[in-house]
Swiss-Prot record:
Belongs to the protein kinase superfamily. Ser/Thr protein kinase family. One of its GO terms (molecular function) is protein tyrosine kinase activity. It catalyses: L-seryl-[protein] + ATP = O-phospho-L-seryl-[protein] + ADP + H(+); L-threonyl-[protein] + ATP = O-phospho-L-threonyl-[protein] + ADP + H(+); L-tyrosyl-[protein] + ATP = O-phospho-L-tyrosyl-[protein] + ADP + H(+). This is Dual specificity protein kinase Ttk. SMART domains: S_TKc. Residues 178-204, 211-230, 493-574 are annotated as: Disordered. Pfam families: Pkinase. The gene is ttk. Induction: Strongly induced in a subpopulation of cells in the proximal blastema during regenerative outgrowth. Its cofactor is Mg(2+). GO terms for biological process: anatomical structure homeostasis; cell division; chromosome segregation; female meiosis chromosome segregation; fin regeneration; male meiosis chromosome segregation; meiotic spindle assembly checkpoint signaling; mitotic spindle assembly checkpoint signaling. Involved in mitotic spindle assembly checkpoint signaling, a process that delays anaphase until chromosomes are bioriented on the spindle, and in the repair of incorrect mitotic kinetochore-spindle microtubule attachments. Required to prevent chromosome segregation errors during meiosis. Required for fin and heart regeneration. Its EC number is 2.7.12.1. Barely detectable in adult somatic tissues. Expressed in immature germ cells that have not completed meiosis. In ovary, expressed predominantly in previtellogenic oocytes. In testis, expressed in primary and secondary spermatocytes, but not mature spermatozoa.
Length: 982
């Protein structure tokens, strides 16, 4: 026993040594101090230099730890340098591009989202468009690659010769849009720009060089090491308290009480760094010229910029800069911003607390008049957040019959269309299915589809609205007439005004009654030129306001003004003092001004994840959206409640993230009020054909019927079917078998055997109930708590118990797992067809087991599809079965992959196969023990004084008895004697 304890102590010592070694390695490799220094410099140039040097330490494609460290570092940089402030800085744009390229190593879809964000916000840089086009070209999307480059010319991205070179290379069929020489020239140009315009000493004086003054140069650099003069509270406010969860405009200047918000892109920079002596307008466009005279600041060391933006006059911008000449003025300004923000949050909460959907609609409508959501990304995100708060307070099932609620649903969908038309289509479908009694809901959806070029669907929506008896019918008839006449606007503005005038008057009356003191101020507040009806017309989704329209709401307003003058609350989806967000997670329309939005999905440390609209507290998100099937252990729903929810039969579920999509369906990870996690499959029946709708309904029927028969079928807890959508509330797993196999080079024998049994049991269950799957593949199985479960029925077909096979009018299945009989032509009477049966599922399962054994499918090495089909059905083509130690496994593989289905083994036989049976060891014959042996053992036990020693000796004796071995008295005595020396 001494040896055992000694061995245990040695193991503990070894573990401690290992931990110390890991800590030492971590200490040596820890770049925290360096990244902190780079971030504290407030210089994208410095941060990019640090990240470039960090990447040179290895190969991110081959080193996951380096890739993770790089992603974390980019995350921290983007958290501290919001996109809205630095998007016009060249180094920042290059960091966005490189981040997207690194994301492509992890997830192509996330990389595409990151490229979209970079292109929509840094559209003046040609290299951003070229990098995105290169990414799409490598994915094989030639058409999208061409479109991106064409859009870059339309956006007047510079330098133009880079775009021209990329187009030339694309037309000549080259895989690289920019040659190595072109990239070097681009890098040298950027380096000259950075070095020539950087301050030469620590006096914060800017030395403009010839390079900086050159007309082709777009931006002055960001300062690196300006002395920072700010209090601790101001540090905290800048770093954390004003971090906006959905929009990375996290610094005070974009949260001011001024209504110009994001339109004043340069002046806020002075405010954000108001306690540091630095040059103003560090990211000014090339259209701005540098003045030689200096501003009359107390220090006299900062240059003013003669800014001539198209929206805000230079005088207005300079006046705003001059307000911050003294620290006292800046402190007062910061305090006003903080007070205004508190009042804004309180104001929206007060409106919601009135339990009036009419009041909420009036507030949101008036709020929207303060800026243009089409061109102001920050304002758009705040509007969406306000709508989300309203919907969270007023459940859809209870208020869908209210006109004001229906109008809010419609306007929310229209605003979502600016960010993501796909999400907007879903929101329109939800609004139309729940508020079908209102004609304007159907017309808005039809207008949205018409604006996307789907005139056929627009007609279908209006026809269904007529059949559903939506009111007023006159509006529908007008919309149909306008559609048939070829007009792009289904309803003129006067129709919108007349249909809503009565409702608006009632809302205004309610507001005057609730806010009698503020009513005069509402009257005085100047609004934009947008008419009261204009906001409801879906066709205006892609409208960009003119500079004249945008000037109207620029006038600063007091923080104590009415609802019209109240700033939109920061979209605090979580704890407002802790949330840190960065450019993130959308799949935006390339033609829209896209807010870098986190789709409310929880972030996994070092590998940030693609939800759906959920962001965790105190963890910065990165500009990407990785769809992670693994739930982070530290993330709890209680700390991350989402404002986006799904209601299924009156029960509300909050969206974590989207974990999958395909065709007309999407799968979300959700949780309820009790923090139970589920998966919700949403199917948009508007986009599905009749056959797809029928297959979805069959899937629900099968799942619902088979719940009681097997634990290897995914659990279906509830579902809701309407004419326009389907909700399926199901069990949520960790990851599918296909992903699990992709992440492993080899599979452990015990895991393979356990998963094989799970698959057989699941398929055996559906076969017993007359269901043939006919498209089994690893992606059809989900790992839930260490067990495999069948998650769908593919192209499942129910057959009668006395029928062995059925005929299909086309070949079905996935080729690498498709049985020969499903490929062979069994046409009759000139009608093509193929045969499927339960034995076909056995072949598919055999291919999965083959993949788990050899790391590939039987015919995976044949790349030509025609040759692969011939090999599958050709009996003379022998399937390779390399020798393996498990002979029973080899026998299973050979019997599953028999081309003749009649000779192929059945599921029932596979369950009884020796491969799945435990191989019991022959039990040893019990040996007789003499009475003298017992006597010696008992005497030895009596001689022991220590209770621990007696217990150990008795334990050894029991182990000998249970093992069936003959009792070794000397061994027992030896063990007992050893304990006496302890």
């Amino acid at each position: 026993m001494d040896e055992e304890e000694s061995t245990e102590r040695q193991m503990q010592i070894a573990m401690l040594c290992q931990k110390l070694a890991m800590m030492k390695q971590l200490f040596n490799e820890d770049d925290t101090d360096y990244i902190n220094q780079a971030i504290s410099s407030n210089s994208p140039d410095t941060c990019r230099t640090f990240l470039s040097n960090l990447e040179k330490k290895g190969n991110p494609q081959a080193d996951p730890s380096l890739l993770s460290k790089l992603m974390d570092s980019y995350t921290r940089v983007f958290s501290s340098m919001p996109l809205g402030k630095y998007s016009q800085n060249e180094s920042y744009a290059k960091m966005l591009v490189r981040f997207a390229e690194l994301k492509a190593i992890q997830d192509v879809n996330d990389a595409q989202t990151s490229f979209d964000i970079a292109r929509s916000h840094c559209k003046d840089f040609a290299f951003v468009h070229v990098a995105y086009a290169q990414f799409e070209l490598l994915q094989g999307n030639m058409k999208k690659c061409t479109m991106i480059l064409q859009k870059a010319f339309e956006m007047n991205a510079k330098p133009r010769h880079v775009l021209e070179a990329a187009v030339r290379n694309l037309k000549t069929g080259k895989r690289q849009l920019l040659s190595h020489e072109d990239k070097e020239n681009l890098s040298v140009s950027a380096l000259d720009h950075t070095q020539g315009s950087r301050r030469s000493d620590g006096t914060c004086e800017l030395k403009p060089s010839n390079t900086f003054l050159h007309s082709d140069q777009k931006f002055s650099p960001q300062e690196e090491n300006g002395p920072v003069w700010r209090t601790g509270s101001q540090h905290r406010r800048t770093a954390m308290a004003e971090r906006v969860p959905m929009v990375p405009l996290s610094i005070p200047e974009n949260e001011t009480s001024d209504s110009d918000c994001a339109q004043k892109a340069e002046a806020p920079f002075t405010h954000s760094s108001g306690f540091s002596r630095q040059t103003s307008g560090s990211s000014v466009r090339s259209a701005f010229s540098l003045c030689s005279s200096k501003k009359g600041t107390p220090d006299g060391d900062s240059y003013s910029l003669n800014i001539k933006p198209p929206v805000i006059s230079p005088d207005y911008l300079r006046e705003d800069i001059e307000e911050g000449h003294t620290i006292t003025a800046l402190l007062n300004r910061a305090e006003k911003r903080e007070t205004a923000r508190t009042e804004e949050t309180t104001d929206i909460n007060q409106i919601i607390s009135t339990n009036s959907t009419e009041g909420c609609q009036a507030f949101l409508k008036n709020l929207e008049k303060r800026a243009d959501p089409h061109s102001d990304a920050a304002f758009l995100s705040k509007l969406l957040d306000c709508y989300s708060k309203v919907f969270a307070r007023f459940p859809l099932a209870e208020h869908c019959k209210t006109e004001s609620y229906a109008r809010m649903l419609v306007r929310y969908a229209e605003l979502k269309g600016i960010e993501d038309p796909e999400d907007a289509a879903d929101d329109f479908s939800i609004a139309r299915s729940h508020c079908k009694a209102f004609a304007f809901v159907h017309i808005a959806h039809a207008q949205f589809e018409l604006s996307r070029g789907n005139s056929r669907k627009s007609v279908s929506i209006l026809q269904k609205a007529l059949s559903s008896n939506a009111r007023p019918i006159e509006l529908l008839q007008t919309a149909i007439r306008n559609l048939k006449s070829g007009k792009t606007l289904l309803l003129p503005a006067e129709h919108q005004e007349s249909s809503e005038a009565e409702n608006v008057e009632a809302q205004n009356g309610m507001k005057r009654e609730e806010n009698p003191v503020k009513a005069p101020e509402d009257h005085q507040k100047p609004f934009s030129k947008e008419t009261s009806s204009e906001w409801k017309i879906p066709a205006l989704i892609t409208k960009h306001t003119s500079p004249e329209d945008r000037k109207a709401p620029v006038e600063p307003v007091s923080s104590s003004s009415s609802h019209h003058a109240v700033r939109t609350p920061a979209p605090l989806r979580l704890n407002p003092s802790l949330s840190c967000q960065t450019p993130n997670y959308r799949q935006p329309n390339p033609n829209s001004f896209v807010t870098p939005v986190v789709k409310q999905r929880p972030v996994i440390v070092s590998v940030p994840a693609t939800a759906q609209k959920m962001c965790p507290t105190a963890l910065p998100c990165t500009p990407q959206s990785g769809v992670s099937y693994i739930q982070p252990p530290t993330q709890t729903p209680s700390s991350a409640f989402s404002n986006e929810s799904i209601t299924i039969k009156g029960k509300q579920f909050f969206i974590f993230k989207m974990i999958g999509r395909g065709g007309s369906s999407k799968v979300y990870q959700v949780f309820d009020h009790k923090k139970h996690v589920y998966a919700v499959k949403y199917v948009n029946l508007e986009e599905a054909d009749a056959q797809a709708v029928e297959s979805y309904k069959n899937e629900i029927e099968h799942l619902n019927h088979l719940q009681q028969y097997s634990d290897q079928i995914i659990k279906l807890y509830d579902y809701e079917i309407t004419s326009s959508y389907i909700y399926m509330l199901m069990e949520c797993g960790h990851l599918d078998l296909n992903t699990w196999l992709r992440n492993r080079k080899t599979v452990k024998p015990l895991d393979r055997k356990a998963y094989w049994r799970n698959m057989l049991e699941a398929v055996h269950t559906i076969h017993k109930h007359g269901i043939v799957h006919s498209d089994l593949k690893p992606a059809n199985f989900l790992i839930v708590d260490g067990s495999l479960k069948l998650i769908d029925f593919g192209i499942a077909n129910q057959i009668q118990p006395d029928v062995t096979s059925i005929m299909k009018d086309s070949q079905v299945g996935t080729l690498n797992y498709m049985p020969p009989e499903a490929i062979k032509d069994t046409s009759s009477n000139g009608k093509p067809g193929s045969k499927i049966s339960a034995k076909g599922d056995v072949w598919s399962l055999g291919c999965i087991l083959y993949c788990m054994t050899y790391g590939k499918t039987p015919f995976q090495n044949i790349t030509n599809q025609i040759s692969k089909i011939h090999a599958i059905i050709d009996p003379s083509h022998e399937i390779d079965f390399p020798d393996i130690p498990e002979k029973d496994l080899l026998d299973v593989l050979k019997k599953c992959l028999v081309r003749n289905p009649r000779e192929r083994i059945s599921i029932a036989e596979l369950l009884d196969h020796p491969y799945l049976q435990l191989q019991p060891q022959p039990a040893p014959e019990p040996a007789e023990t003499s009475s003298s042996d017992f006597k010696r053992i008992l005497n030895e036990l009596v001689a022991l004084q220590s209770p621990n020693s007696i217990a150990r000796a008795a334990s050894n004796l029991a182990m000998m008895c249970n093992s069936g071995r003959k009792l070794d008295v000397s061994e027992c005595v030896k063990s007992s004697s050893q304990t006496l020396w302890k």
